[in-house]
Amino acid sequence: MEENVTYKAVCIVEDEEKIRLLADFTREEILRLLSVKPMTETQLSQKLGLTKAAIGYHLHLLAEADMVHIEKVEAEKHGILQKYYSPAAALFIVDPDKIPKDVKTYFTQTQIQFLRGL
């Protein structure tokens, strides 16, 4: 069930729908955690303090947009399959000229927070 997917170092995001997906703190954190190492829904839910259902919802949206993929599947005791997710790229950079007006504030605030941390 493992997918043969090419991993990119950097992905420039220009598609408005993908940009809207990235304008969400939870999805941003999921991608950040997955860029460190592949993780399961359970591991992500424990790290982020969210339910597995919430994580599953966000992973589904990211997978539909080809921003994450299943890197491997492992069977646990009792036959439960654990899917390990990885991002399609180590870093997603949003093209500032393509950001829809309704989410521009989110990215501006995110950039300000990033610069304050430098």
Predicted regions: what they are:
Residues 1-21:
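N-terminal leader segment of winged-helix/HTH proteins
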Residues 53:
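Key DNA-contact positions within bacterial/archaeal DNA-binding proteins
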Residues 43-49, 62:
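A short acidic, leucine-rich amphipathic alpha-helix
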Residues 14-15, 19, 75-117:
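Conserved segment of winged-helix/HTH DNA-binding domains
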